[in-house]
Amino acid sequence: MKPLVLTAFALVLAVHALDASISIPQAQAAQRPLERFTVTADGHPLAVWARRPAAPVGAVLFVHGRTWSARPDFDLQVPGLSRSVMSTFAAQGFAAYGVDLRGYGATPRDKTDWLTPKRSADDIVSVLTWIAEQHPRLPKPTLVGWSRGAAMAGMAAQMAPDRLSNVVLFGFAFDPDLKFVSIDSDKPLKLKNSAAAAESDFISPEITPKAVISAFVEQALKTDPVLVDVKKDDEFNDFVPAKMETPTLLLFGSDDPGMVMDDAGKMFAKLGAKDKQMVVLPGADHAAHLEDTHDAWVAAILNFIKRPASRR
């Protein structure tokens, strides 16, 4: 996946500063079954995948990035390893959901054959609304977006702050003083995805077992054989960090080649939310949630969700 970045530093929490009381129960991680739901957004069916404990304490929606859909990104099955984000969150007591945006995974393209940022953000809001309806006694869902999905998650949080309780922007930051531009083709290209593209995010062999890469390539090409056609990237200019009021976690790996530290610090400083954190995972890259940094990535998000309120 190629991260969406245009291309000061206010707060960084190193992973070793995270709450040590959070442990990731690997043996239980695969116990919850994978469920599939269909959520209708503006008349279009969206595939939503879930792993849910019997009595969840919260709900989380994961939004994939540019190239691959929810299952390879957030429910990766690796023999002998626990790398499914949804399984790990379910084992921690959270109802974990992942959406396939239009054209991705099990969700068909719409009649336009294109996907735009605003269309995606509107669909994310529809799924957030549906999740809240499934869990009326729980807090509103936490929204987690990866790479391009983080930009769309930011748009959704800004559009409908009443539909979520937190937003996590993972593997994405930009200079708020610059503008996004659109470079659109005349017609949808429907290019075939490749094994090389599936391998491209795994750039750190010291934290990336070959089994993870092999599993991702196989599962990603199976779910997403054709690249979705996107346009109107200038709509990302609707995401204005200063207008973001939802509690926000900015999360990325120290070795993510798509992240510019100065841009991350500048964006973090301009976030309108008073309740915000930035966490840098040492040694991690763009696919931190799938590599040996999986547990640290999960712990960063759980710590943010479970952060205590002020009290005397």
Indicate residue ranges for each PLM-predicted region.
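Conserved alpha/beta-hydrolase "acid-adjacent" motif
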Residues: 257-263
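Alpha/beta-hydrolase fold nucleophile elbow
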Residues: 135-147
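Short beta-strand/loop motif that positions the catalytic acidic residue
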Residues: 244, 250-252
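Glycine-rich "HGGG/HGxG" loop immediately N-terminal to the catalytic nucleophile
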Residues: 71-72, 100-115, 286
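Short, surface-exposed "cap/lid" segments of acyl-processing enzymes
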Residues: 55, 60-94
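Catalytic histidine-centered segment of alpha/beta-hydrolase-like enzymes
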Residues: 284-294
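Alpha/beta-hydrolase active-site loop
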Residues: 114-134
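N-terminal cap/lid segment of alpha/beta-hydrolase-fold proteins
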Residues: 24, 28-54
